[in-house]
Curated annotation (Swiss-Prot):
Biased composition (Gly residues): 426-437
Pfam family, one: Hormone_recep
Biased composition (Low complexity): 444-462
Organism of origin: Canis lupus familiaris
Biased composition (Polar residues): 52-64
Annotated protein name in UniProt: Retinoic acid receptor alpha
Residue numbers binding all-trans-retinoate: C235, S287
DNA-binding interval(s): 88-153
PANTHER family the UniProt entry points to: NUCLEAR HORMONE RECEPTOR, RETINOIC ACID RECEPTOR ALPHA
Annotated segments matching region Hinge: 154-182
Post-translational modifications reported in the UniProt record: Phosphorylated on serine and threonine residues. Phosphorylation does not change during cell cycle. Phosphorylation on Ser-77 is crucial for the N-terminal AF1 transcriptional activity. Under stress conditions, MAPK8 enhances phosphorylation on Thr-181, Ser-445 and Ser-461 leading to RARA ubiquitination and degradation. Phosphorylation by AKT1 inhibits the transactivation activity. On retinoic acid stimulation, phosphorylation on Ser-369 by RPS6KA5 promotes interaction with GTF2H3 and the CDK7-mediated phosphorylation of Ser-77.
Compartment annotation: Nucleus; Cytoplasm
Any one GO molecular-function label of the UniProt entry: RNA polymerase II cis-regulatory region sequence-specific DNA binding
Amino acid sequence: MASNSSSCPTPGGGHLNGYPVPPYAFFFPPMLGGLSPPGALTTLQHQLPVSGYSTPSPATIETQSSSSEEIVPSPPSPPPLPRIYKPCFVCQDKSSGYHYGVSACEGCKGFFRRSIQKNMVYTCHRDKNCIINKVTRNRCQYCRLQKCFEVGMSKESVRNDRNKKKKEAPKPECSESYTLTPEVGELIEKVRKAHQETFPALCQLGKYTTNNSSEQRVSLDIDLWDKFSELSTKCIIKTVEFAKQLPGFTTLTIADQITLLKAACLDILILRICTRYTPEQDTMTFSEGLTLNRTQMHKAGFGPLTDLVFAFANQLLPLEMDDAETGLLSAICLICGDRQDLEQPDRVDMLQEPLLEALKVYVRKRRPSRPHMFPKMLMKITDLRSISAKGAERVITLKMEIPGSMPPLIQEMLENSEGLDTLSGQPGGGGRDGGGLAPPPGSCSPSLSPSSNRSSPATHSP
């Protein structure tokens, strides 16, 4: 046993457990630190051979590192260069960044997002090849949207962005309360009064029907058409009166007032008549109490538009809208800054904002347990525009069915920047070559102008 003990190499002999110590002795202290007590580790480090290399202590490394930093300071980071984007790919305006896959300005970004989210359907009234630039981008929404697609804007990016915001947005509190401020309350009452004075409720009308009881959807009934066109003219006049009572509307330029009325008149007429729908009899009641069923409305001139109007009326029933809500929704349809050829679209948007706020507060205060009713109402505006576009197309075929000319006020209402340019030059039409009713820019329309002194006939309100 003694001989075995004496034959073991000692630390001072340059070997450890029979193996030569490598020259890189500083690899071992970390590993040995967990196996040997601190005192033994220090003794062992002093006994290990150096072999040309010294083992720096942690304190030495730290001192060298800190002194090195003091001698050679790191250079300061240069300031980031401002990002310069290419002009907007759609209209060549100044770009605010990359939106939905391309460099775009704020205007085109917002237009594309709204168009996709609301599934907007636009129509080009020229050759579907309009020039889109900073000046002309608001003149043709159809060609502007097509240009967005052509330059690479992505529908999926809009949807993904919307879904991302939905996930990130906190869930609204159902107990959120909405208080009607005096200003909002006054605005609501003004709009309610304007609506009621130009559109009496169904209960105020004495219903009457026609003698035509045929249930076959055949050709146009001329007698029904004559009566319906007469009532429609009165409805248009009442719509103009409604617009003149809306706060701020008459402060707009005359040209913008006419543009808004022509663009939204059919929307408002359809919304109004659909609030007079009676589901039990499947009938609609017009001004003076004229009540028609589906077949009679088809013969009166609605034609293939009939089922669309009745379907929309059925969709309104669950909303249970009162006069204030119908009036506010009509006002929002009318005062809308995205209509074509407006001189001051930003000012129109400013007038629309308090109407939107008033409708939101009123709807949520009236239905505190149904927070989604307000957006549902706003979505009906998109449906109205779609039906109105088809209604304008219906006029083209209707002109070939009626024996005489189209009533002037109805034709003028539909001959607008978003309606029927194709009526120009037709018999009885208001085209450029036919002494049209539409006024030139800056002039006042003799019939649709809100500043006109023309008053409605002394008949029942529509």
